[in-house]
Amino acid sequence: MYFCEKYSYMLPEFLPCSSLFADSKCTPVHFNKHEKMHDLELQKYEIALIGVNPILSDLFRHKFYSLSLDHFRMLSIIDLGNLKDVSDFNVANTVMHLMDLKIIPILIGSSLSHFTQMHLQCSQVLMPHRFALVSDNMSRIDDLLISHSMFLKEFYSIGVQRHLQTSDSIHSISKILYLSEFRKKLSNIEPFTRNVDAAFFDLNAIRHSDFSASYNSNPSGLFSEEASSICKYFGSGDKTKALFISSWKTEQDASGTNELLIAQMVWYFIEGYGLKKTDHSNHKKNLTQYIVEIKNTGIQINFYKSEISGKWWFEEPIIDMDHSNVLIPCTYDEYLNTVQEQVPDRILEYLN
């Protein structure tokens, strides 16, 4: 179980999918035809699609089910329909219940307040967690997401644009991957997504020319291909348990191009999940070790590489002798920089 067993869940009610989608013969997705969650045999599913905003969610479905889903016939996916009660508590409660069943929920048309409520409920059940936010502006982070952060071990901000930030919006708990750093090399995002429990994708992070339905109409931001790539990285994350996708404006594009992009983002998230090769990083016998000694410092950093997936980690120094060292995700480039005695700041944070 992911969460404390004493936590009591109120099973949510759904508005089942329209027959327009449920009658589709060309998709491996199972469609919910029940209003009560307890009428479903949920344990057999791996991924659940959930509509939070019913109008947006059905627009998304029109595009998603037009894509080639044959790639996912080996996966167990269910479209639960649209939630009846979209209060912050009920949405977060639904996500936590599905996560307890080891089902990854993908929420369409969600809000940051839902994400915040999930953080609060994780803290209530004493669950350490790591969250990620894809957004152009860190000021969108709700104050509650930063408060009560004893159990929020790490918070990653991805795609942030420097010119939109104020100095007080950069909180010490947040690890930032600026848009410019992400664009230098796409794989820079991989350590940020590897250990994330849940991610919120703010569609305002996508530039207006690629996504005209954003609320901000920002001329700069992620390209559409980058948005899909980020979702694929989240899907392939070893610990990813939930994906929230924000709401958007519907009147900007009668052709449905915006909804098609969101459908593609979800498609690549599912592909990432299907293709991932989970590495049991706690079992070092399955990893190749590389020892790097920093000259004139006495510092030794142990790196590990999985020969299965090519993923890299470095070993956090022992703090408590009663516990084994923690392996922190990193990139091959960070390993090479360390070998050349140019230790990245992100690694130095763990050594100091």
Protein language model features and the residues they cover:
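Conserved alpha-helical scaffold segments that buttress catalytic/binding sites
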Residues: 3-245, 249-352
